[in-house]
């Protein structure tokens, strides 16, 4: 069965604390209350921050984030030498988002500011300022993400919104994202 799931706020908290998968916590890094009772929204945000600020074993977290990324890559990546799928290819949007999600989940217990509703570029910059990643890499990947989103928005207005783009012209962005991915997940 599928459909809208309605549970109490405390049941949601209990599930997130005891049963949620890592990918569900990754989704919480992006989740925001947007409509409804403001008390429920406030409580949701408290729970979201509580969950994101839990200490985690970094090696296990890395393993789970990388495994999920591999599943997505295997299912959706273009894997072309001349064309690039902005969202799914290695060095693309999902890699940036997974890096940020890992940094939030891995370090928010030490740096609560990582749970703010700031966006990926600001969170990359903050991670650089906190010494979690190299600040120059943070800036380069932030620039890559900004360009990817610009290209993604332009494609959505075109007749072919899901078509890949040429790799030519974005190689430096792909390389920057791949370099940060290796720096974060290779050790």
Whereabouts are the PLM-identified features?
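A nucleotide- and high-energy phosphate-metabolite-utilizing enzyme signature
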Residues: 1-187
């Amino acid at each position: 069965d599928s459909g809208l799931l309605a549970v109490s706020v405390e049941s949601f908290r209990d599930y997130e604390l005891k049963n949620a998968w890592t990918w569900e916590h990754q989704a919480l890094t992006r989740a925001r209350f947007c409509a409804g009772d403001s008390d429920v929204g406030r409580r949701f945000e408290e729970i979201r921050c509580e969950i994101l600020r839990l200490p985690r074993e970094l090696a296990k977290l890395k393993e789970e984030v990388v495994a999920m990324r591999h599943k997505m890559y295997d299912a959706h990546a273009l894997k072309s030498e001349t064309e690039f799928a902005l969202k799914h290819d290695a060095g693309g949007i999902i890699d940036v988002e997974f890096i940020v999600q890992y940094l939030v989940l891995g370090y928010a217990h030490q740096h609560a500011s990582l749970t703010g509703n700031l966006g990926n570029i600001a969170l990359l910059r903050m991670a650089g300022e906190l010494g979690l990643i190299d600040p120059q890499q943070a800036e380069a990947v932030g620039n890559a993400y900004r360009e990817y989103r610009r290209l993604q928005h332009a494609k959505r207005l075109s007749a072919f919104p899901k078509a890949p783009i040429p790799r030519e012209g974005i190689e430096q962005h792909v390389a920057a994202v791949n370099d940060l991915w290796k720096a974060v997940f290779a050790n």
